[in-house]
Amino acid sequence: MAARPIRPIVPSTRQTSTAAGRESSLTLDRGLALLQAVADADSEAPTISELATAIGASRAAVYRLLVPLQERGLVRRDGSKVRLGLGLLRLAAKVTPQLRLAALPALRELAESVGATAHLTVADGDEAQAIAVIEPSWTTYHVAYRVGTRHSLGRGAAGKAIGLRDETPGWIATTGELQPGASGIAAPVRGVPGLRASVGVITFHELDGDVVGPKVRAAATAVADALR
């Protein structure tokens, strides 16, 4: 009796697509890890070898992963060195409007509740920059705190709140650090990866921290929830 030929086992379409999807996901993850390694490197332009060590891959793998990142302008190569590309600026330009839009409802409610100018402030290097500001509608006067206002992270409630540790109280108050006679209370926006920001209020009248502090902290939490 003749032996039957052994049929090769051919993966099903579902198995093949699942494997391909898993491989694509791993490649994407490694590509993002590589981009992060370039951004986090101690030097301005890390080498291929340094990046390979940073992400636990071979030099050949790093070269392959760099190709799509270069094509999209996210990185640029200078010989064996790699720098961040200008394409990241185009992506970054889309972030601020989205942050502002997500924060506006919470800021509006905070400003109306406290009767003070409410703001969302983000860290930009060693400075704090206001990217969204809402003024109360019913007060006679209020602090003119404008979008784009910058100051040191070490001055004012907005900047100092960004650096608050998780184990510290949820808000911080300052007086006269940015404008003479102006008082501010701010709380950090926590739980949003990659975002260093705070929500706060600033006014010329005295603020009761026991009353306003929890409101500011709740607004910061609402902003974080809107961004997740």
What role is predicted for each listed range?
Residues 81-167:
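Amphipathic alpha-helical effector-binding/dimerization core
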Residues 74-77, 120-121, 189:
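A structural signal for short hydrophobic beta-strand segments in well-ordered beta-sheet cores
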Residues 2-97, 225:
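N-terminal helix-turn-helix
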